[in-house]
Every structure is written in C-alpha cells, then in structure tokens.
Amino acid sequence: MIQQRTLKNTIRATGVGLHSGDKVYMTLRPAPVNHGIVFRRVDLDPVVEVPAKAELVTEVTLCTGLTCNDAKIQTVEHLMSALAGLGVDNIIVELSSAELPIMDGSAGPFVFLLQSAGIVEQDAPKRFIRVLKTVEVTEGDKVARFSPYEGYKLGFTIQFDHPMIPAKQSRQEIEFSTLAYTKEISRARTFGFMRDLEYMRERNLGLGGSMDNAIVLDEFRVLNEDGLRYADEFVRHKILDAIGDLYLAGGQVLGAYEGFKSGHALNNKLVRALMADATAWEWVSFDSPATPDPVEYATPAYA
C-alpha cells in the first residue's frame, strides 16, 4: 500500500532567485490529505495561493512558472522534482517573493530540507496517473512522449555541439525510485553557456546566476573550478527538470517518459495533452497490501 505523504515539521530556508536575483524567504509547511502542492505568496496582501497545476503554467523560458490571480511563482521545477522524488503529495510552500530560491542549481538542497523536516505517511492512499496509451508532442525536431509502462521510467537525449557534451554522455535513462532519484539525479545542476549571457540579461533572466548555482561553459570547457558532479550531469539535470515539470500533472505519473531535446515548454505541452485526452489516462491507487508497489519510495524519514 502506498499512502499520501506530507512533512512532519515546518522548515525554512533563504536563498536568491536565479532569474530575478531577489532574496527570498521560503517556508515549507505540512498539509492535510488531498490538499496537494500549493504555493503561497505571503508578500502579497491579501496572500495569494497558487496550486501546482500544469494548466497554470504561463512561463516556460528557461524555467517553469505559474500564474494565478495575477500572482506569479517562478522556477518551481527543482522543488517540484524533489517533492516527486521523495513522494510528497501535500505541502504548503510559502514565499516572500515571486521566485523560488535556486540554492545550488540542483534539487539536492531541497531533498535535504524535506528530509530534515521529516516525511510522514497520511491516512489516505496515494493517487497515481496511469498512462493508458501513447501521447506525443513535438516542436520541430524536439519530442516529448508518454507511453504505457508498469512503473515510472524516464529517458532523455540532449544534443549540444560542445566538446564537454559528447554524444556518449548525451543520453540517460532511469527507472524511477527514491533511491535512484536521490543518488543519480537530484544533485545534477542547471547549466548555461557564456555566449547566452547577453541574451538572458537583456530579458532580465539569470540575474541571480553564478558558478555557485549553475554549471557555466565557455566554447571549450566547464568554467567551474570543481568541475562536474557526474560525467553526464547535463542530461541528468534535464531528467531532474522533467520529473518536476511532469509532477505538475497533479499526481505521480505511471508510465514511460521519453524526451528528445525537450524542455519546460514541451514538457508542459505533453502534460496538457495527456490530461486533455480522457482515454489516455486514469487515476489509480494501490491500497491493498497484496498489490505490488509500482514505484519504490523510501521509508519515511521521521525528523
């Protein structure tokens, strides 16, 4: 039986927004059964709540952003990814600004925060979105696809003409579980190229970016003194992003995801296409002890 999960305790963190450069205070609070993931802009009067739902995505340029009642929540994908990785269904995320803190550019610090707060099971079965038929979206040569699958599997291929991103390190696939996520995916950082810096600055993007929270490349090499955490950290981060983007479906997907040069825009388009076709998916729960669990979540960590 897989039950819903929330936090045991409230926990707080401070950081800077990757794109805004603004300092932000974040508070993660427990939430009741079937509450879902809800962001709360506590700097606004009155306070505005923004549910983590794919249909509220309005920003897909270099991040995933939500808008509800004119209130924006930017760069949600890394926290959403960590919540998916640890199986957290219900949580309140309070923010003092419009953008989540970027932390170190990965989901690792969010995983640490969630584990430090403690994760508890709730008295209700976890609800999954089971893919019943293949759904695919494209944009030029970019592809994102869901296919039926017993568990949750993600594959991703990137293509960059750069000596640090050779073809042999441009493809990765994982069978999703908490262990695989925390060890193989969660610490992969976001990345950017020096050549794109001017473009980003003109659009007020990346204002909080630095080598402390991103991998930075020039035309030939990685500029960060500490180098890479994984040889294929770039494609692993794309999987990290996809896990977060797909969790905006409103539940954990059961199926196989395949991305080819996909990004936030195409991932959101895929989720919307899936949810728009009532014959392509169904809600399922696993509340019988005799039923094998389709996804392996770690035993809750009680803080």
From Swiss-Prot:
Keywords: Hydrolase, Lipid A biosynthesis, Lipid biosynthesis, Lipid metabolism, Metal-binding, Zinc
GO (cellular component) term, any one: membrane
A GO term for molecular function: UDP-3-O-acyl-N-acetylglucosamine deacetylase activity
Residues annotated as binding Zn(2+): H78, H237, D241
InterPro entries: Ribosomal_Su5_D2-typ_SF, UDP-acyl_GlcNac_deAcase, UDP-acyl_GlcNac_deAcase_C, UDP-acyl_N-AcGlcN_deAcase_N
Catalysed reactions, as listed in the record: a UDP-3-O-[(3R)-3-hydroxyacyl]-N-acetyl-alpha-D-glucosamine + H2O = a UDP-3-O-[(3R)-3-hydroxyacyl]-alpha-D-glucosamine + acetate
Cofactor(s) in the UniProt record: Zn(2+)
Keyword Zinc: yes
Pathway: Glycolipid biosynthesis; lipid IV(A) biosynthesis; lipid IV(A) from (3R)-3-hydroxytetradecanoyl-[acyl-carrier-protein] and UDP-N-acetyl-alpha-D-glucosamine: step 2/6
Function: Catalyzes the hydrolysis of UDP-3-O-myristoyl-N-acetylglucosamine to form UDP-3-O-myristoylglucosamine and acetate, the committed step in lipid A biosynthesis.
Protein name according to UniProt: UDP-3-O-acyl-N-acetylglucosamine deacetylase
Protein's organism: Stenotrophomonas maltophilia (strain K279a)
Lineage: Bacteria, Pseudomonadati, Pseudomonadota, Gammaproteobacteria, Lysobacterales
